[in-house]
Amino acid sequence: VNKTGIINYLEDLKLIVVLPEAGNSWYVNSPFYKNRNYEDFVIKELITFVERKYRVISTRHGRSIAGLSMGGYGAIKFGLKYPNYFYLVGSFSGAFNWRQLMDRSRYSVAQSIIEAFGEKKSEHWDRNDVFVLVDSLINKVQPYFYISCGSDDEVEGLLSSNRDFVKLIQSKQIRYEYHELPGGHNWLFWDREIKNFLRLFRECNLR
């Protein structure tokens, strides 16, 4: 929150923003650690908690989800796996290429990926791969996907994986918009995109 202007961006919006702490979990249910079921936490616990505690619209039209980098991947994954839960889904510099990052990243990142997804080519991989999950959305209610990435993103393979994912969902006639804008893998880019996403949220709620 301190690295963005989100507090100011929310001044004229009637919504609650929830920022869960997920560490390096990749927002999945870990195949190794029972206390790291972050997908279940978000979908089965957090949403229910918020909707019981606050006066909100408890349908997909009252919910959106977005994230950056690892969180961008997580938001897209949740939108694909649980389309009945969300109306609008956003990803800024989404790390869709975690398979590639496992082999090419520094140890701490690679280790977090292994702990989240398991050893190579396990069943857990396909259950959490956004490229695989796209087909599960066919003939179902679909969220609207907002995807963006910096044209100068320095994480190897990340920009190309965003382009590849957009080509895939376009071929499946899934509703989306894609913005490839000047910027890197940093808060300067993400802050602008948070503002743009909230602008889209406002427009969707005025339709």
Pin down the residues of each PLM region.
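Non-catalytic cap/lid and distal C-terminal segments of serine-dependent acyl enzymes
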Residues: 1-207
